[in-house]
């Protein structure tokens, strides 16, 4: 069963690689992920609380003070 699963996943990856030109799929996936993350959660405004996994609108978190910059 494991061998069949590995062969199936390999075939899927080869099919996907042939469908998209080199580099195009990677950038499309990043844009899609970025868009989905912005839709599902808002960003934390300046001086808002942040931590190890910050979601600051500016993408900068002062880790010592735990506030968005």
Swiss-Prot record:
It comes from the Eukaryota. GO terms for molecular function: ion channel inhibitor activity; toxin activity. Keywords: Disulfide bond, Knottin, Secreted, Signal, Toxin. One of its GO terms (cellular component) is extracellular region. It holds the Pfam family Conotoxin. Disulfide bonds join 43-57, 50-61, 56-68. This is Conotoxin LvVID. It is found in: Secreted. The keyword Glycoprotein does not apply. The presence of a 'disulfide through disulfide knot' structurally defines this protein as a knottin. The cysteine framework is VI/VII (C-C-CC-C-C). Residues 1-17 form the signal peptide. Expressed by the venom duct. Residues 18-40 form a propeptide. Belongs to the conotoxin O1 superfamily.
